[in-house]
């Protein structure tokens, strides 16, 4: 079984400078994975404005007079952007829709049309002090499809360290296949980052071996859980190969009679809060940060999701969030 396939990419845009930063990255990803790129623009429903016009008796019909002009201009803007940034072989379709909530419309459209990745700018026209604006943040929270959010200029050719966060739970390992695929594709190494929170964390249930110490006990347990996860997902061509050096291993990928390896490092830190430690480490060491998020209620799901959302709001580097499947939540 292949780790990841990215055949269809959806790029939401509001034509702001923030959303434009995603266009060249989408092209780079599409070239690498052989993907088709579709663009979508959501025109927010001007419900209250329409009602006010009617009350004032202004002779203007939103459906007949205003929306058609906005749609026509949006169509032209999308076509110009796709012509400027995308290669012909990666250029897909474009869509303009009128919806009440852009974030909900993006998530639903991506799910309905079986996209493999949503790739969007961290901030659009809704500029805020947070690095990921409200629309992007809501898409990250709600999407069942991986979301790749990019801010400043980003060159995939410079990727050296892909960082995957884990709280040691199986839910957090849902992001492992994509993180490993990215490291493999960009000839980078993968670093798994785990935080032992001072006031309790998911790794508390891991037995400590007094002869090895806390960090080594957690490290060995997580490596074992990853191999179990890969076996459960029938990814028989991928496994973690121990090197004999603590915290330094290899991800071995077998393709027929050929095999290749990805340098795989584990970093364990103690801290008051996971999101604070992740932000600090990722800002200094990571080129791409990959995290699992939630989408369900419940204490464990809330902790996993809120950590991902907090980190995604404030780190400057590209962030990819992956939501575990419903089956994984139910296990």
What are these regions (language model features)?
Residues 2-61, 161-219, 284, 314, ...:
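Small/aliphatic-rich secondary-structure junction motif
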Residues 1-4, 44-47, 64-65, 72, ...:
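Structural beta-alpha unit
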Residues 120-138, 270-275, 291-314, 328-330:
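Glycine-rich, Arg-bearing micro-motifs that act as flexible, cationic patches
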Residues 134-154:
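Short, structured interface segments
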Residues 143, 286, 315:
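An anion/phosphate-binding loop that grips the pyrophosphate of nucleotide cofactors and donors
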Residues 42, 123, 152-154, 195, ...:
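Short, ordered loop/turn segments at secondary-structure junctions
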């Amino acid at each position: 079984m292949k780790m990841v396939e990215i055949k269809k990419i959806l790029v939401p845009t509001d034509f702001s400078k923030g959303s434009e930063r995603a266009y060249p990255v989408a092209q780079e990803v599409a070239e690498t994975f052989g993907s088709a790129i579709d663009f979508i623009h959501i025109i927010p429903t001007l419900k209250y404005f329409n009602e006010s016009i009617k009350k004032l008796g202004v002779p203007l019909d939103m459906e007949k007079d205003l929306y058609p002009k906005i749609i026509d201009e949006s169509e032209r803007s999308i076509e110009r952007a796709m012509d400027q940034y995308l290669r012909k072989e990666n250029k897909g379709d474009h869509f303009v829709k009128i919806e009440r909530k852009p974030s909900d419309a993006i998530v639903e459209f991506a799910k309905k049309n079986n996209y493999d990745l949503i790739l969007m700018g961290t901030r659009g026209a809704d500029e805020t002090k947070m690095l990921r604006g409200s629309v992007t943040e809501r898409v990250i929270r709600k999407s069942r499809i991986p979301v790749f959010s990019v801010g400043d200029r980003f060159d995939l050719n410079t990727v050296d360290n892909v960082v995957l966060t884990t709280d040691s739970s199986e839910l957090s390992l849902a992001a492992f296949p994509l993180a490993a695929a990215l490291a493999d594709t960009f000839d980078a190494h993968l670093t798994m980052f785990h935080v032992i929170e001072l006031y309790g964390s998911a790794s508390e249930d891991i037995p400590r071996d007094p002869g090895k110490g806390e960090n080594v006990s957690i490290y060995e347990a997580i490596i074992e859980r990853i191999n179990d996860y890969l076996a459960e997902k029938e990814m028989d061509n991928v496994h973690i190969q121990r090197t004999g050096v603590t915290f330094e291993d290899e991800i071995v990928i077998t393709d027929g009679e050929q095999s290749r390896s990805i340098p795989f490092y584990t970093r364990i830190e103690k801290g008051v809060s996971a999101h604070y430690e992740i932000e600090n480490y990722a800002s200094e060491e990571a080129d791409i940060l990959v995290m699992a998020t939630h989408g369900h209620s419940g204490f464990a799901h809330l902790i996993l999701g809120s950590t991902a959302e907090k980190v995604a709001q404030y780190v400057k580097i590209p962030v990819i969030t992956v939501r575990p499947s419903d089956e994984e939540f139910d296990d």
